[in-house]
A protein has these predicted regions:
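Short, structured surface patches at the beginning of a domain
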Residues: 1-160
Length: 160
């Protein structure tokens, strides 16, 4: 069975929400509704702080360098403003798996590590980063990656 990998609600996170927005509904205010759902969910986690929403428009994800808001989000990560990215699905970020793999590895290698949580797939990149038996070779460091200990020293992982 597939393990669910989620960020630990007891950890302090500065969150950037990435949305690829393409309204296919009859509702004009769908984006506001979508943002409210994220705000309501984050409000349930007192140690989580919403930094900003990063919204790129379009039905499909471009390559990362073409997504202005994704680039702004990555810059905020590198500047220490965001340490957890939450987005609906992998396909929102990039259509190129190698590009996403490199990006998630670079983020996980930061000090402190920066994770990405993909809601639809229920994948949290730092869970596999810290726990060897959860490792997915498409997204995460290879077996020789030994910078951090195998145990979860900071309580960043919640496995349900």
């Amino acid at each position: 069975s597939i393990r669910h990998e989620r960020p630990n609600t007891e950890s302090n996170y500065k969150i950037g929400i990435y949305i690829r927005y393409f309204n296919q509904t009859k509702y004009e205010d769908y984006l506001s509704y979508h943002k409210k759902q994220f705000n309501d969910t984050i409000a349930l986690c007192p140690k989580w702080e919403l930094v900003d929403f990063y919204i790129d428009e379009g039905a499909t994800a471009p390559h990362m360098e073409s997504a202005k808001e994704w680039s702004r989000l990555l810059q905020d990560c590198m500047d220490g403003k965001v340490n957890l990215i939450i987005t609906q699905k992998i396909g929102n970020v990039s259509r190129d798996m190698q590009e996403l793999t490199i990006c998630s590895r670079l983020l996980a290698a930061q000090n402190p590590p920066i994770g990405i949580y993909f809601i639809s797939e229920d994948i949290f990149t730092l869970a596999s980063y810290y726990t060897r038996d959860l490792r997915d070779t498409k997204f995460f460091p290879s077996e020789d990656w030994e910078i951090l200990p195998d145990e979860d020293p900071k309580g960043l992982i919640s496995n349900d």
